């Protein structure tokens, strides 16, 4: 298999965090790294993962998607809901929507109030966001110019619906912001995307591994499914894994550390299979307990969202691009020029608002899309249309991940427990009603047709709740299932080191104590950049001195240009 079976570090999972660690650790001369990935390579000629506008395709099938399903969700009509996770070099950055959103400064300041997490404040994290990024319009106090992640900003001349939707949000009384990752996240504005200057998906495989794999000290094994982490006493000493369809377990040893970067579903699963987790779960499955750690797989969080869809009265939406006869020309322009519809994820505008003054920072996120279709490419509305994705950001609901057997090929039991709190329902009711007010503003008068979904007959609390139960979907942001902290349910410390064990860290979205306000790819890369310096024994980057917006006692909303009354 591999000639050498001992390495300084073994990284499990070549996703957004794992690839970042692999690249940074091998910058140090002589440091050897084994990077294990259960999926395959990120084939550069496969338009499904490389063309931004094709983002729905890799979610279909199982080549690039683990395609997990939840247990029946009790507050969602007992639906088994999708839980897509990336499989292949790049992990979920190979199949995500490419929205580059870092979260709100207050998310990180909130983490830093927890004992042991004092150095996770926004100004401590900002230098690592900048380190990871190359933004196409150049660096500033908030953005980087030399990092491995290519970030593309929306350009003049893009779809007029993006501008109309942002204007409508401002006319509805909400703030405007020119950069959702800059001084002020709160408000409506253009949304950056992780796309290269020539219109390709900027996954972490492209950004970090393309450089790192030139180094002889990095060994990458694809189709390598981790069975378990190997321990001697309380010290992690290696990994046992399977390659392809083989049942032969290959062992590799780590001289320094094992770094678990499987993401919020796989990391707790691998820990539990390795004997690290709630003892009662492990005992039931006859898994020998290495360390009883009750928080492994608990505290699971996600973002739930739904779409409001409208007909478009002018032929400016992307509806024609869904027709097969128009797609060859779109594909050719993208392939040869790196431009056109294919070069964008089409989420070029969005926003963050507070649905009430009860929230210190935004609790609702919008993505605007100039076509009416399901995120996974199904159920396209057969006419010109547009939609707003709306969802709550910091639900109090908590779920869990549990292994069902010792077999590494068996999927775990996943329950998010979506919409378990009254706050969830109130936020979604408010979110839908506020979206309708935004959509009725003058900026959308030239374009707005009838409301396709939910439909104008869906007005009462009960009707809205029923719509959410039946139609809300995951935003694909699972996180927090191996949280950082010092309390009895924390799994790792502020450097990702697993409590009670030696030489083992978890570095991915699972270690977030509380989910961030927005998409999770950029924060996951930042977390890995920050912990990479800890592993390497380097001084942390100097704290930023940039200003950032805190709402304080500012109202969540001003007077709308056009007042809209809600039917009860």
From Swiss-Prot:
It is an enzyme of class 1 (oxidoreductase). The keyword Oxidoreductase applies. GO terms for cellular component: membrane. It comes from the Bacteria. The keyword NAD applies. SUPFAM superfamilies: FAD-linked reductases, C-terminal domain (SSF54373), FAD/NAD(P)-binding domain (SSF51905). Keywords: FAD, Flavoprotein, NAD, Oxidoreductase. Pfam families: GMC_oxred_C (PF05199), GMC_oxred_N (PF00732). InterPro entries: BetA, FAD/NAD-bd_sf, GMC_OxRdtase, GMC_OxRdtase_N, GMC_OxRtase_C. It catalyses: choline + A = betaine aldehyde + AH2; betaine aldehyde + NAD(+) + H2O = glycine betaine + NADH + 2 H(+). Its cofactor is FAD. The active site is at residue 477. Its EC number is 1.1.99.1, 1.2.1.8. FAD binds at residues 8-37. One of its GO terms (biological process) is glycine betaine biosynthetic process from choline. GO terms for molecular function: betaine-aldehyde dehydrogenase (NAD+) activity; choline dehydrogenase activity; flavin adenine dinucleotide binding. Pathway: Amine and polyamine biosynthesis; betaine biosynthesis via choline pathway; betaine aldehyde from choline (cytochrome c reductase route): step 1/1. Involved in the biosynthesis of the osmoprotectant glycine betaine. Catalyzes the oxidation of choline to betaine aldehyde and betaine aldehyde to glycine betaine at the same rate. Belongs to the GMC oxidoreductase family. This is Oxygen-dependent choline dehydrogenase. It comes from Pseudomonas syringae pv. syringae (strain B728a). The gene is betA.
């Amino acid at each position: 298999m591999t000639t050498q079976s001992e390495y300084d570090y073994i990284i499990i999972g070549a996703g957004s965090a794992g690839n970042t660690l692999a690249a940074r650790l091998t910058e140090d001369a002589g440091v050897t790294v084994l990077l294990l990935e259960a999926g395959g390579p990120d084939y550069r000629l496969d338009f499904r993962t490389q063309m931004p506008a094709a983002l729905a395709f890799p979610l279909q099938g199982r080549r690039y998607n683990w395609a997990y399903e939840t247990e029946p969700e009790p507050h969602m009509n007992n639906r088994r809901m999708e839980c897509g996770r990336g499989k292949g070099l790049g992990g979920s950055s190979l199949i995500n929507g490419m929205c580059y959103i870092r979260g709100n400064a207050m998310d990180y300041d909130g983490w830093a109030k927890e004992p042991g997490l004092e150095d996770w404040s926004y100004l401590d994290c900002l230098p690592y966001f900048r380190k990871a990024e190359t933004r196409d319009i150049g660096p500033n106090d908030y953005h980087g110019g030399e990092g491995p992640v290519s970030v593309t900003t929306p350009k003049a001349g893009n779809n007029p619906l993006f501008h109309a939707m942002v204007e409508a949000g401002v006319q509805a009384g909400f703030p405007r912001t020119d950069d959702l990752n800059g001084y002020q996240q709160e408000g409506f504005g253009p949304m950056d995307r992780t796309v290269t200057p020539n219109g390709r998906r900027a996954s972490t495989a492209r950004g970090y591994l393309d450089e790192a794999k030139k180094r002889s000290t990095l060994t990458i094994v694809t189709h390598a499914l981790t069975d378990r982490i190997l321990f001697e006493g309380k010290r992690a000493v290696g990994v046992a894994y399977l390659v392809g369809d083989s049942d032969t377990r290959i062992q590799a040893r780590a001289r320094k550390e094992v770094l678990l970067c499987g993401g919020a579903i796989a990391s707790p699963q691998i820990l539990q299979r390795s004997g690290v987790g709630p003892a009662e779960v492990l005992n039931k499955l006859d898994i020998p307990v290495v360390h009883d750690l009750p928080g492994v797989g608990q505290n699971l969080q996600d973002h739930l969202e739904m779409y409001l869809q409208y007909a478009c009265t002018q032929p400016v939406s992307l509806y024609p691009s869904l027709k097969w006869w128009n797609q060859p020309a779109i594909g050719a322009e993208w392939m040869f020029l790196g431009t056109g519809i294919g070069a964008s994820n089409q989420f070029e505008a969005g926003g963050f608002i507070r649905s009430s003054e009860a929230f210190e920072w935004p609790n609702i996120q919008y993505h605007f899309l100039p076509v009416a279709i399901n995120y996974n490419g199904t159920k396209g509305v057969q006419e010109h249309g547009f939609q707003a994705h709306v969802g709550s950001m910091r639900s109090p609901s908590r779920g869990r991940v549990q292994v069902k057997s010792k077999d590494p090929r068996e999927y775990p039991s996943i329950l998010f427990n979506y919409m378990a709190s009254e706050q969830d329902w109130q936020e979604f009711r408010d979110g839908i009603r506020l979206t309708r007010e935004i959509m009725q503003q003058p900026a959308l008068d030239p374009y707005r047709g009838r409301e396709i979904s939910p439909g104008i007959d869906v007005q009462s609390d009960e009707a809205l709740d029923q719509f959410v139960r039946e139609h809300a979907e995951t935003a694909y942001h699972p996180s927090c299932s191996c949280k950082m902290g010092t309390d009895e349910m924390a799994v790792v410390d502020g450097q990702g080191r697993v409590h009670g064990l030696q030489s083992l860290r978890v570095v991915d979205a699972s270690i977030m104590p509380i989910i961030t306000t927005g998409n999770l790819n950029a924060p996951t890369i930042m977390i890995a950049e920050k912990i990479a310096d800890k592993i390497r024994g380097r001084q942390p980057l100097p704290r930023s001195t940039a200003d950032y917006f805190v709402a304080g006692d500012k109202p969540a909303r001003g007077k709308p240009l056009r007042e809209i009354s809600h039917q009860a």
